[in-house]
């Protein structure tokens, strides 16, 4: 038996609504989002120069990402406010592509998933890197922000590998 996909934030008449999760049971949930920031060689060199940018830029982006995950429900109108148990932000430097790859992981034990929190954290980390490097490269590209993994709840485990 297959079901027709629907937009859960629209009611039968097409009006927006916040999904009612009050009847759901709390379950362990995790989501991982990924994205990248690509820049020119000059900006990448400044970012990765010892004692220069890497520590400050990436630490600032990490803190911004954690704050963004915690405030997700304030930014996305129909997103539920939920208790985050964990937010982790990891960066991988890719010298060949002059890129910073971002991974945001969020966990909760709640009635709804943490996909939006992970996606928001990843997005804000990328925006923070952009902001702090834009003086050296006006053409920085934020790309491939996506949900990579989610687990928990009725829909179970999902991967985008």
UniProtKB/Swiss-Prot annotation:
Question: GO MF terms on file?
Answer: cyclic pyranopterin monophosphate synthase activity
The protein's matches in InterPro entries, at most eight in alphabetical order, are given as: MoaC (IPR023045), MoaC_bact/euk (IPR047594), MoaC_sf (IPR036522), MoCo_biosynth_MoaA/MoaC (IPR050105), Mopterin_CF_biosynth-C_dom (IPR002820)
Which GO BP annotation is one of this protein's?
Mo-molybdopterin cofactor biosynthetic process
Q: Which reaction does it catalyse?
A: (8S)-3',8-cyclo-7,8-dihydroguanosine 5'-triphosphate = cyclic pyranopterin phosphate + diphosphate
Which parts of the sequence bind substrate?
Answer: 78-80, 116-117
Active site, per annotation? 131
Family matches, as SUPFAM superfamilies: Molybdenum cofactor biosynthesis protein C, MoaC
Q: How does it assemble?
A: Homohexamer; trimer of dimers.
Q: Which family does it belong to?
A: Belongs to the MoaC family.
Q: State what protein this is by name.
A: Cyclic pyranopterin monophosphate synthase
Per the UniProt record, the source organism is: Bordetella parapertussis (strain 12822 / ATCC BAA-587 / NCTC 13253)
């Amino acid at each position: 038996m297959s079901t027709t996909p629907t937009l859960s934030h629209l009611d039968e008449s097409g009006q927006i609504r916040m999904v009612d999760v009050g009847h759901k049971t709390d379950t362990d949930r995790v989501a991982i989002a990924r994205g990248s920031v690509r820049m020119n060689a000059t900006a990448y060199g400044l970012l990765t120069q010892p004692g220069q940018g890497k520590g400050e830029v990436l630490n600032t982006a990490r803190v911004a990402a954690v704050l963004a995950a915690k405030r997700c429900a304030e930014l996305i109108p129909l997103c539920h406010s939920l208790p985050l148990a964990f937010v982790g932000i990891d960066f991988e430097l890719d010298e060949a592509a002059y890129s910073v790859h971002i991974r945001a992981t969020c966990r909760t034990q709640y009635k709804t998933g943490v996909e939006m929190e992970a996606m928001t954290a990843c997005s804000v980390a990328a925006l923070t890197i952009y902001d702090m490097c834009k003086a050296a490269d006006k053409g920085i590209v934020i790309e491939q922000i996506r949900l990579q993994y989610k687990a928990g709840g009725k829909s179970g485990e999902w991967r985008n590998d």
